[in-house]
């Protein structure tokens, strides 16, 4: 996401690193000189329905990696790479948001949104309901809702 907005992720030689989470192990510097200036003038809200941090046993790699087919060794390597990334971001921005609830969302996009874009996080259903005027639309109505499956990470899980 940050690359698409103009950020460059550099290794120790000043070359751009490869794409992908494991490539973050080689990260040594983040160049924000080309970051889109319009980002400083907007308020960003993120629809986020998970509270996972970026790293650690409850982080993106450990929780979501196995769901995507990552082996235990790949999970550990990815968590190490994400910690490298978080360390560099913390030094660059003088703040560490790796443990922010939602930082581990979408493979770490939550972390980038919070750290670089100062995004505010809201539950997805709340954001959509507010934007669509749902509370006014259903006043006086009876509404039934169902979720196709229950996952352990959802707050409503048993």
Predicted regions and their residues:
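Glycine/threonine-rich beta-strand-loop-alpha-helix active-site module
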Residues: 1-43
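Gly/Ser/Thr-rich active-site loops/lids in small-molecule metabolic enzymes
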Residues: 2, 6-13, 65-83, 123-130
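Short coil/turn connectors at secondary-structure junctions
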Residues: 7, 12-14, 39-43, 59, ...
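Short beta-strand segments
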Residues: 43-51, 146-150
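Acidic, glycine-rich loop-and-beta core segments that form the ion-binding/anion-interacting portion
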Residues: 50-51, 55-96
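Oxyanion-binding "anion nests"
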Residues: 77-144
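Histidine- and/or cysteine-centered catalytic micro-motif in compact active-site loops
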Residues: 126, 149-152
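Glycine/threonine-rich flexible loop motifs
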Residues: 153-158
């Amino acid at each position: 996401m940050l690359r698409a907005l103009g950020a460059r992720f550099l290794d120790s030689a000043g070359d751009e690193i490869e794409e992908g989470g494991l490539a973050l192990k080689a990260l040594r510097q983040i160049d924000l000189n080309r970051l889109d200036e319009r980002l400083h003038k907007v308020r960003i809200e993120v629809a986020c329905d998970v509270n996972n941090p970026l790293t650690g046993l409850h982080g993106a790699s450990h929780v979501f990696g196995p769901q995507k087919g990552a082996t235990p060794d790949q999970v550990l390597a990815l968590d190490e790479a994400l910690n490298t990334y978080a360390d560099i971001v913390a030094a660059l921005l003088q703040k560490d948001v790796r443990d922010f609830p939602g930082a581990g969302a979408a493979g770490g996009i939550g972390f980038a949104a919070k750290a670089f874009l100062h995004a505010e996080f809201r539950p997805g259903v709340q954001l959509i309901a507010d934007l669509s005027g749902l509370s006014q639309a259903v006043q006086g109505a009876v509404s039934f809702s169902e979720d196709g499956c229950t996952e352990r990470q959802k707050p409503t899980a048993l």
